[in-house]
């Protein structure tokens, strides 16, 4: 009797899963597609600010674009965003960035971030979730000519572009990334 009831519950759960799973997967696909489209727009904005950045897009082994990073703080701060990862110009996955900071800081801002990977080893470290940026690593502001003088450090170079907001800070923190390959 107990086995029959368990079997009915299992069949019912599988039935419900069949009803809702396609909707969940579709929502994930739409979210992923939105991030990819936002990344394309962010790439265009970076190139508009600094046309010479085209050389980095062309010559790097890969790059990750985070089109919408939100940051806020009052003493302790945090930031986060999702992005698209490219290898040789082709989308290979998505990534999530999380940042925590501590120090004298207040406000909020939105910005874009792009990370260029000089070689396969640097991209592999990123995909293995082994790249973290500490307070000593800073992004280069994307403006005309900035990428011409940019140098890779440990196989990566980072650019950011402010989208809006005001942030006053003297803080230390770090960024951590989580990579997820496309399905």
Residue ranges and their predicted role:
Residues 9, 22, 71-73:
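An N-terminal domain-start capping segment
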Residues 28-183:
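Small-residue-enriched, tightly packed secondary-structure blocks
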Residues 1-2, 25:
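Generic cytosolic/nucleocytoplasmic N-terminal low-complexity/intrinsically disordered segments
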Residues 21-27:
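Sec/Tat signal peptide C-region and signal peptidase I cleavage site
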Residues 2-13:
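Bacterial N-terminal signal peptides that target proteins for export
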Residues 13-15, 25:
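Cleavable N-terminal signal peptides
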């Amino acid at each position: 009797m107990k086995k029959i009831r368990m079997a009915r519950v299992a069949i019912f759960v599988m039935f419900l899963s069949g009803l809702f799973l396609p909707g969940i997967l579709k929502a994930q696909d739409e979210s992923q597609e939105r991030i990819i489209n936002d990344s394309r727009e962010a790439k265009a904005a970076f190139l508009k600010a600094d046309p010479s950045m085209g050389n980095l897009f062309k010559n790097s082994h890969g790059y990750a674009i985070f089109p919408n990073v939100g940051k806020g703080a009052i003493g302790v701060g945090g930031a986060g965003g999702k992005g698209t990862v490219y290898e040789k110009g082709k989308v290979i996955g998505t990534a999530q960035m999380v940042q925590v900071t501590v120090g004298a800081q207040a406000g909020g801002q939105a910005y874009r971030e792009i990370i260029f990977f000089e070689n396969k080893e640097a991209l592999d470290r990123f995909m293995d979730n082994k790249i973290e940026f500490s307070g000593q690593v800073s992004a280069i502001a994307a403006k005309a000519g900035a990428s011409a003088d940019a140098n890779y450090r440990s196989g990566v170079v980072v650019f950011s572009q402010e989208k809006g907001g005001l942030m006053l800070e003297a803080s230390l923190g770090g960024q951590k990334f989580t990579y997820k390959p496309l399905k």
